[in-house]
């Protein structure tokens, strides 16, 4: 399966298939320097795939291999500075391509390195997780600060995205469920039919763990995101809808140190409660609690914290404006809206969420 973005210029292919990594051979031919930024865990789990990637370069090219941790500890100024200095010491040129092999963290980090070193060099995303089907498309790259996630970054398109489905076969269930949250989010943005289809396909942990038919939903999720991003690349309008579940999600992720997708699913649940409170919707909260529990999401983490630190984190969200905290809420399935939510409603909704989960 292959998609091509439809921007006015600088379009790139998104290739989704088994053994997609072989496409690197042709893509890398124009470059003098090739830099692989690789998740150490991926190299350990699938050394033959990494070797396959490395063999795509020619003897005439300068190849650099940098191995980093595939978690949020990599997305720091310290690691960023270390990688930048190491590459500059290798005297890389503007005729360089950086290849990010790993999950969303690696894509975010390597993309930010590519966007900033020598005022920008090309990079290729090779996502190895389900979660990265979302982050590898759309051109957002960045690193974290002590104040929150992704607060330093850029909009910077890759040269290509190679989604090699072979990588998914080694994922633990924690990674599968984390990635599924973004796939499910895209279904909610699409409408009731898409929601019913995905909940029917993956009713419980056993079904999701099997990965059967997941590639179909990955493609739909990528297409959903592309349709929005191409219309609003720099998040001035509709692209904000892709942050469904992320305002509260980023806060609980940072506070409880849980996987991104698990936090997003909790954030989706929270926004249903806020929507019922603020928009007079009638979402069946117990339906979502039961469904998320069937998929083994750690909803109980909400009981391990209180509201004040979460509010402080939500107050730093990039979507906010001078009127306060902005959230993406569903007026109904498939109809998102960005709306200002006051602290009183946020706190009341948090208390309601905790009561549901006690």
Curated annotation (Swiss-Prot):
Keywords per UniProt: Amino-acid biosynthesis, Aromatic amino acid biosynthesis, Cobalt, Cytoplasm, Lyase, Metal-binding, NAD, Nucleotide-binding, Zinc
**Cofactor binding description:** Binds 1 divalent metal cation per subunit. Can use either Co(2+) or Zn(2+).
| Binding residue positions for Zn(2+) | 182, 246, 260
Give the location in the cell: Cytoplasm
Enzymatic reactions: 7-phospho-2-dehydro-3-deoxy-D-arabino-heptonate = 3-dehydroquinate + phosphate
Carries keyword Lyase? yes
Coiled coil location: none
> Which GO biological process entries does UniProt record here?
amino acid biosynthetic process; aromatic amino acid family biosynthetic process; chorismate biosynthetic process
**What exactly does this protein do?**
Catalyzes the conversion of 3-deoxy-D-arabino-heptulosonate 7-phosphate (DAHP) to dehydroquinate (DHQ).
In Swiss-Prot or TrEMBL terms, this protein is called 3-dehydroquinate synthase
Q: Which source organism does the UniProt entry give?
A: Staphylococcus carnosus (strain TM300)
* Recorded name of the encoding gene: aroB
């Amino acid at each position: 399966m292959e998609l091509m973005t439809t921007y006015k210029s600088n379009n790139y292919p998104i290739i989704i298939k088994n053994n997609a990594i072989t496409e690197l051979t042709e893509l890398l031919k124009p470059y003098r320097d090739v830099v692989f930024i690789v998740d150490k865990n991926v190299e350990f789990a699938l050394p033959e795939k990494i070797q396959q990637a490395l063999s795509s370069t020619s003897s005439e090219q300068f190849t650099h291999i940098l191995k980093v941790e595939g978690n949020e500890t990599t997305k720091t100024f310290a690691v960023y500075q270390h990688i930048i200095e190491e590459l500059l010491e290798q005297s890389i040129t503007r005729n360089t391509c950086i290849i990010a092999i790993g999950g969303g963290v690696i894509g975010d980090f390597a993309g930010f390195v590519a966007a900033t070193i020598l005022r920008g060099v090309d990079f290729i995303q090779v996502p190895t997780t389900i979660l990265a089907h979302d982050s590898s498309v759309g051109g957002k790259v960045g690193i974290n600060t002590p104040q929150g996630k992704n607060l330093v970054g850029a909009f910077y398109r890759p040269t290509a995205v190679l989604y090699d489905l072979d990588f998914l076969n080694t994922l633990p269930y924690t990674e599968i469920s984390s990635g599924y949250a973004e796939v499910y989010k895209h279904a909610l943005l699409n409408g009731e039919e898409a929601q019913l289809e995905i909940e029917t396909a993956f009713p419980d942990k056993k079904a999701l763990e099997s990965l059967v038919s997941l590639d179909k939903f990955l493609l739909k999720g990528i297409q959903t995101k592309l349709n929005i991003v191409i219309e609003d690349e720099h998040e001035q309008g509709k692209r904000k809808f892709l942050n469904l579940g992320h305002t509260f999600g980023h806060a609980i992720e940072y506070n409880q140190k849980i996987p991104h997708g698990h936090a997003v699913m909790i954030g989706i649940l929270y926004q249903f409660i806020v929507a019922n409170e603020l928009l007079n919707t009638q979402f069946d909260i117990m339906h979502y609690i039961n469904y998320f529990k069937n998929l083994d999401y750690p909803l109980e983490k909400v009981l391990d914290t209180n509201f004040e630190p979460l509010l402080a984190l939500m107050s730093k969200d990039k979507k906010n404006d001078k009127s306060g905290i902005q959230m993406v809420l569903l007026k109904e399935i498939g109809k998102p809206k960005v709306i200002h939510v006051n602290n009183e409603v946020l706190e009341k909704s948090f208390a309601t969420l905790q009561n549901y989960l006690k």
